[in-house]
Design a protein with these regions (language model features):
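Short hydrophobic beta-strand element within catalytic cores of glycosyltransferases
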Residues: 294-297, 307
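An aromatic- and histidine-rich active-site surface loop
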Residues: 87-111
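Conserved acidic donor-binding segment of nucleotide-sugar-dependent glycosyltransferases
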Residues: 309-310, 314-321, 330-335
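Conserved donor-binding/catalytic core segment of Leloir-type glycosyltransferases
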Residues: 147, 190-217, 229
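Carbohydrate-associated surface elements
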Residues: 152, 173
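N-terminal strand-loop element at the rim of the active site
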Residues: 7-11, 18, 23-68
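A short, well-ordered alpha-helix in the C-terminal region of glycosyltransferases
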Residues: 323, 330, 337-351, 360-363
Length: 373
C-alpha cells in the first residue's frame, strides 16, 4: 500500500507513534510519505521506502495568521499525486483530519481514504472548545476510519461529540527488543548520583504536574538515598526547578532536557513517576515498563489500560503525592519487590508489541480500501 502520514513534528507521544508506525510499515514493504510542518524528531535518517515532505509556510500581508490548514491540504494533494497515495493516516482530528478531508474533496479523482487517529487533546481540549467543536465532529464523522489510542478515549469521543460512526481502539506500541537491548556507553552523562533513580519524562506542560514529581521525590528522599532525573522540557520546567530548591533537594535533581532516544536513559531508572492530570494512553509509561521500570502514576484516562495496579506499578488519585510517595517506597524499599514489579512490567509491555499493533492498522487500511470496491 501507499500511505501518507501526517503528525506533529514534536517529541510528544503522537509524533513518536506516528513516526515509528511509518517506519514499521516501510519495513513491511509499504511505501510511506510523511507530510508535516517540520522535520520529525524520530526521522533523522530516511529509511528505504520512506519520503518526507515539508508543508512550507509563507507570510502574506493581508492575512493576520497564516492558514496552515489550507497549506497542509494543498501539500497533501501535491504529495498524493506525486506518490500515488491511497491512504492518508492523520494523527489528531484537529487540525490534521480537517486538512486531509479538504485534500480528499479537492482531488476526488485520487480516491484518497482518510484514517484519523485520536490521541487525546484533540478531543479533551482542542476539539471540545466551542470554536472547533463542529469541525472536529465533522472530521471524525467524515473520515473513512477512526481509531482511538485507548478505550477511555474512545468513550470520551463518543460521549463528547455524540459520535454515531464506529471507532476502533488501537493501542500505542513499543518494540520490546529495542527496550531490552543494553546500550553501554550511550547513556547521556548525568552529573549527580544516588542509590535509586526516580525518573520523569514529559513535555513539562502544566497538565503533567511536574511539581508533584518533585514533591513525591522529596518525600521518598526522607527514607531512601535517591536521585531524580527530569527528562524533557517545557513551560513548567522552571517552576519544578524552583520547587526543588525550596524543598532542599535541588542537589539530587537533574534536569536532563530533551533526549532523542529514550531507551538509553530509561536504563538508568528504577521507577518512573507520571502524576499527570490526564493521559489518553501514557506512552512513556509503556516505554518504561518495556525497559523493566515500574510506574507510579495517576488513575486517569487510559493509564489503567497500560499500568496494572499492584503488578506493574501503582495508580493514585491526581494530586495525592503522599500516596504516590508511599507506593514508590513500597517498590523501591525491597529489591525482591522491585524485581517482581520489573519482571511483570516487561511481561505486560509485550502485549503492546508493534508487530500486533501495526498489523491492526494494516487491517484497517485494507478495510477502507476494500470499501471503495
Amino acid at each position: 500500500m501507499r500511505i501518507g502520514i501526517t503528525c506533529y513534528p514534536t517529541h510528544g507521544g503522537s509524533g513518536v507513534v506516528a513516526t515509528e508506525l511509518g517506519k514499521h510499515l516501510a519495513r513491511a514493504g509499504h511505501e510511506v510519505a510523511f507530510i508535516s510542518y517540520a522535520a520529525l524528531l524520530r526521522l533523522s535518517e530516511i529509511p528505504e521506502r520512506v519520503s518526507f515532505h515539508e508543508a512550507e509556510g509563507y507570510s502574506y500581508p493581508l492575512l493576520q495568521n497564516y492558514p496552515h490548514g489550507v497549506a497542509l491540504a494543498s501539500k497533501i494533494v501535491s504529495v498524493a499525486r506525486m506518490r500515488h497515495l491511497q491512504i492518508l493516516h492523520v494523527h489528531y482530528a484537529i487540525p490534521f483530519a480537517a486538512s486531509a478531508l479538504m485534500a480528499k474533496y479537492a482531488a476526488p479523482e485520487l480516491d484518497l481514504k482518510v484514517v484519523t487517529t485520536l490521541h487525546g487533546t484533540d478531543i479533551t481540549l482542542v476539539g471540545s472548545d466551542p470554536t472547533f467543536r463542529p469541525i472536529t465532529r465533522w472530521a471524525i464523522e467524515q473520515s473513512d476510519a477512526v481509531t482511538a489510542v485507548s478505550q477511555w478515549l474512545h468513550d470520551e469521543a463518543v460521549k463528547e461529540f455524540a459520535i454515531r460512526r464506529p471507532i476502533d481502539v488501537v493501542y500505542n506500541f513499543i518494540d520490546p527488543e529495542r527496550h531490552a537491548r543494553p546500550c553501554p556507553g550511550c547513556i547521556p552523562p548525568v552529573s549527580c548520583s544516588g542509590e535509586v533513580t526516580l525518573m520523569h519524562i514529559s513535555n513539562f506542560r502544566p497538565v503533567k504536574r511536574t511539581e508533584d514529581v518533585v514533591r513525591v521525590f522529596a518525600r521518598v528522599r526522607e527514607h531512601l538515598e535517591a536521585r531524580l532525573l527530569m527528562v524533557g522540557d517545557g513551560p513548567a520546567a522552571g517552576a519544578a526547578q524552583q520547587l526543588a530548591v525550596d524543598l532542599g533537594v535541588a542537589d539530587r535533581v537533574c534536569f536532563v532536557g530533551i533526549v532523542e532516544q529514550i531507551e538509553p536513559i530509561l536504563q538508568q531508572a528504577d521507577l518512573l513517576l507520571l502524576p499527570s492530570e490526564t493521559e489518553s494512553f501514557g506512552l512513556v509509561a509503556l516505554e518504561a515498563m518495556a525497559s523493566g521500570v515500574p510506574v507510579v502514576a495517576t488513575h486517569v484516562g487510559g493509564l489503567p489500560e497500560v499500568v496494572s495496579h499492584g503488578e506493574t506499578g501503582f495508580l493514585a488519585p491526581v494530586g495525592d503525592v503522599d500516596a504516590m510517595a508511599a507506593y514508590a517506597l513500597q517498590i523501591l524499599g525491597d529489591r525482591a519487590v522491585h524485581r517482581r514489579f520489573a519482571d511483570a512490567s516487561r511481561e505486560r509491555a509485550r502485549l503492546f508489541d508493534y508487530r500486533e499493533i501495526v498489523g491492526q492498522y494494516e487491517a484497517i487500511y485494507e478495510r477502507v480500501l476494500w470499501q471503495s470496491h
